[in-house]
Each structure stands twice: as structure tokens, then as C-alpha cells.
């Protein structure tokens, strides 16, 4: 399990990619992280390979996503950490070439962008919400994977 440190929290406040109000066209494998982002993609006809959700926004405001996902997995991931269970499930899901999968989080999904970038293949599009700004779209690259490895080293490991 990895615990968020103040140093990493400061780093994560900065978007990892370009922030969009409306996304450009997206091709290839897509992972969405967050309820509002996923709802936006689905309402625009974009079905991610994997959607990571906790059915809340801003920690406690409920979000209704009227979509029936093809495959659903659940894991626990407490606030401010990346659980071993979440890491193992994301690692497994990164090997599946299916669409319309959901990973439902009991707890909080905010930090799960980190293991998604670590385990999903290069050129995967990752989309997550940047509170009160829009959505961040990034493509996984080797350089981004190296940045994530550094962040993980700066987190407290238990």
C-alpha cells in the first residue's frame, strides 16, 4: 500500500497533461478515472476500455451514471492511498483488451491514475478530472511511466 505524502500531493495538483473543457477525438485504448469524466465520455458516445468510479464527486456529492457496464469489478481503496488490492486489479485489467469495464472503488479513486499509468501500455489515453478546470487527457509514454515511478518512490510504502 502506498500513502500520499505532502510532497506528492503538491505534485499531483499539477495536471499531467493538457486540460480540456471538451475533449478532442480519442483513438485506441481509453481509461477514464472519475465519475464526472466517465459520465461526460459516455454521454458523448465514447465507451472507455476501463472506467474507474466511486459514484461521488468532490469526495461526497453523489453521481448517477445511467450506464450498464459490460463487466464490473470492485476493490477497496481508502482515501489518500493506493491499496495493494487496487494495484493488483489494475495490473490485471491492463492485460484485457475489452471495452466497457468498470472498476468500482469503495473509498476513493483519485490516486488510481498512478497505477493506471504504471501498468497500462504506452499509447493508452488516460482521462481524469481536474477539479473546477476540466478534463486532463494524456497518452501514456515511457517518460510518463518514469515520472510515475518517481512519485511512487516519494510516497510512503506500507
Curated annotation (Swiss-Prot):
Its EC number is 2.7.1.237. It holds the Pfam family DUF359. GTP binds at residues 35-36, 54, 56, 109, 132. GO terms for molecular function: GTP binding; kinase activity. It catalyses: 3'-dephospho-CoA + GTP = GDP + CoA + H(+). Signal peptide: none annotated. Pathway: Cofactor biosynthesis; coenzyme A biosynthesis. Disulfide bonds: none annotated. Keywords: Coenzyme A biosynthesis, GTP-binding, Kinase, Nucleotide-binding, Transferase. One of its GO terms (biological process) is coenzyme A biosynthetic process. The keyword Flavoprotein does not apply. Catalyzes the GTP-dependent phosphorylation of the 3'-hydroxyl group of dephosphocoenzyme A to form coenzyme A (CoA). PANTHER family: GTP-DEPENDENT DEPHOSPHO-COA KINASE (PTHR40732:SF1), UPF0218 PROTEIN TK1697 (PTHR40732). Belongs to the GTP-dependent DPCK family. This is GTP-dependent dephospho-CoA kinase. It comes from Methanococcus maripaludis (strain C7 / ATCC BAA-1331).
Amino acid at each position: 500500500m502506498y500513502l500520499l505524502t505532502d510532497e506528492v500531493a503538491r505534485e499531483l495538483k499539477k495536471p499531467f497533461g493538457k486540460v480540456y473543457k471538451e475533449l478532442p477525438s480519442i483513438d485506441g485504448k481509453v481509461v477514464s478515472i472519475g465519475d464526472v469524466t466517465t459520465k461526460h465520455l459516455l454521454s458523448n458516445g465514447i465507451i472507455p476500455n476501463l472506467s474507474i468510479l466511486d459514484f461521488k464527486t468532490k469526495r461526497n456529492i453523489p453521481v448517477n451514471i445511467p450506464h450498464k457496464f459490460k463487466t464490473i469489478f470492485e476493490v477497496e481503496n481508502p482515501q489518500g492511498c493506493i491499496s495493494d488490492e487496487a494495484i493488483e486489479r489494475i495490473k490485471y485489467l491492463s492485460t484485457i483488451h475489452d471495452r466497457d469495464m468498470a472498476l468500482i472503488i469503495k473509498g476513493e479513486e483519485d490516486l488510481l491514475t498512478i497505477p493506471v499509468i504504471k501498468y497500462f501500455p504506452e499509447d493508452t489515453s488516460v482521462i481524469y478530472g481536474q477539479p473546477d478546470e476540466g478534463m486532463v487527457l494524456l497518452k501514456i509514454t515511457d517518460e510518463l511511466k518514469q515520472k510515475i515511478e518517481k512519485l511512487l518512490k516519494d510516497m510512503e510504502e506500507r
